[in-house]
Amino acid sequence: MKMLVKQIYENAKELDKSKIKIKGWVVTSRGNKKIQFIELNDGSSVLHLQLVLKSEKMDLNDIHFKTGSSIKAEGILNYTPKAEQSVELIVDKISLLAQSDEDFPIQTKKTTLEFLRTIPHLRHRSNTIKAVMLVRSSISFFIHEYFQKNDFSLVAAPIITSNDGEGAGETFIVDSEDKEPFFGNNVKATLGVTGQLHAEAYALGLQKVYTFAPTFRAENSNTKKHAAEFWMVEPEVAFFTLKELIQMSEEMLKYVIKKVLEKRRDELVFLDTHIKPGLIQSLEDFLESNLEIIEYRKVIEILEKNKVFFEEQNIEFGMDLKTEHERFIAEKYAKGPVGVINYPKKLKAFYMYQNDDNETVAAFDLLVPGIGELVGGSQRENRYEKLEQRIQELNIDQKDIQWYLDLRKYGYSGSAGFGLGLERLVMYITGIDNIRDSIPFPRTPNNLKM
């Protein structure tokens, strides 16, 4: 029967002494005239399957497979759980599908992540990037599964839009080569920085919605946390309060992490061993944690008392927290995930609900050790006059988002939603510390390979 490596390891006991057919790529090859061992990987798992070739079954002089070559083999599966190699295939037939050139850049010696970034078309054939991308795939699946199980509707937010949802102005302009404006005169088309505004429109009718799409920021930042193109998960729920939103974000993260720990255990064990020791324990600790909620004002007090530990020591109310501050709160103060609420309104987007103090908004950031901000969300401003006033204060062109204001005229009693950067979550779950290694084809300043 045809099998994948992942299926073989998951069902090894039942498959013992079964005839198996498999296709994949050569990772290593070694041996002598009497016996040869080939490590094969087929992309379904970070684990390799050892193929055993014996001279009494075939002429080993004809077996010359270079690293990276694709092959097919069939034979009898041998399951020996107490042996160092618990599963191996005793090969009856083997053939070359496509030989790999000798200059295949991913060999058995350890390859740095920096080098792998120079070959984005091949780097997923390394163990590390393969493990990360398999985990990423499962994370995406379980995010969808969580929302679908909880009666959310997936909304396809547009990639091309006429408004800057965050109001930061860091957008990529979209146009054609024609002399005439493609979308008409006086229309500034950009790549979307968020699907939140469109999700909010659909929540006013479908109640529970989410978007899962690429977003774009023309932010000239060359840090480990920033990319020009990344994926955002943005749920929006009508009638929701900030408290309910925070509870949902914690529940969703725990659901996804628990499922990934079950589904991608082999990949996480590899990453725990080679990338971030203690990774699995930290994820299991997250599942057992209770999210602590703390006011932004309290955070400032804590940081002020500990400012000697920071590069940015100008601590005051109204400051935008740096990653070092966020990590300190999560790692040293809370010693786990923490939700920071009620940020100064000047730090947040125009659409957030203004608290009675007229100084803060009903917003939250969920901070986690090792990353800092993982999730950011808010209750939305449902009062037309308040929202209009805030738009004017920030000098946002009202005509571009009049439709968003108009939502408040037609039965809008409020909603709440958050944004989760998929790559940030991939980094947290895999232990990878650079966003460039959490996405298949990273787009960053001065970097547009492929």
Swiss-Prot record:
Coiled coil: none annotated. Gene3D superfamilies: Bira Bifunctional Protein, Domain 2 (3.30.930.10), Nucleic acid-binding proteins (2.40.50.140). InterPro entries: Aa-tRNA-synt_II, aa-tRNA-synth_II, aa-tRNA-synth_II/BPL/LPL, Asn-tRNA-ligase, Asp/Asn-tRNA-synth_IIb, NA-bd_OB-fold, NA-bd_OB_tRNA. It is found in: Cytoplasm. Pfam families: tRNA-synt_2, tRNA_anti-codon. It catalyses: tRNA(Asn) + L-asparagine + ATP = L-asparaginyl-tRNA(Asn) + AMP + diphosphate + H(+). Its EC number is 6.1.1.22. GO terms for cellular component: cytoplasm. Keywords: Aminoacyl-tRNA synthetase, ATP-binding, Cytoplasm, Ligase, Nucleotide-binding, Protein biosynthesis. One of its GO terms (biological process) is asparaginyl-tRNA aminoacylation. One of its GO terms (molecular function) is nucleic acid binding. It comes from the Bacteria. Its main location: cytoplasm. Homodimer. Belongs to the class-II aminoacyl-tRNA synthetase family. PANTHER family: ASPARAGINE--TRNA LIGASE, MITOCHONDRIAL-RELATED, ASPARTYL/LYSYL-TRNA SYNTHETASE. This is Asparagine--tRNA ligase. It comes from Mycoplasmopsis pulmonis (strain UAB CTIP) (Mycoplasma pulmonis).
